[in-house]
Amino acid sequence: RALFGRGEGVACILGTGSNSCWCRGGEIVENVPPLGYVLGDEGSGAALGRNLVNGIFKGHIPLREEFLAAHGLTYEEIILRVYREPYANRFLASFAPFVHAYLDCPEVRAMVAETFADFAQRNLSRYPVHLTVACIGGVAAAFEGLLREVLAHGGYRVGLIAASPAEGLIKYHYGK
């Protein structure tokens, strides 16, 4: 409702987690299950963090020292936080600002683009291609330029991208 009101389109949330649905007339027509950060949540902050940590420790992203210094963590502490402590999704998503800060690094930019392309392939491809795609959430807003680029490259029409649904919900419910 915040993105399309009573219209039609594919509404997406890209924040700590991710979700999408085809909506029409303010109602959900279809939803591809997000499956959470272990099995899904493509395009989310948790996915960006997971892919960053993977890329850094497997040597695909050349920012290991910068990352460890910025977060005051060791490899062992990261593994412990992900596998032994609660809210691993939030922990992984907390690395999104680092990702954003290093977006000019070609390997980071490629990783973010791949993360968004994965979201499109695994989620958006399940909906009719003629529908406009709009996104809400901190990740969507922070990476808006690259998100638009990746979705347009995939053949999607991209509408509104915003950090918060508040303005759209006020408009929907109060007509303002």
Each PLM stretch: what is its role?
Residues 4-10, 53-176:
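ATP-binding/phosphotransfer module of carbohydrate and carboxylate kinases, centering on a glycine-rich
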Residues 1-66:
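Phosphate-binding/catalytic loop of phosphoryl-transfer enzymes
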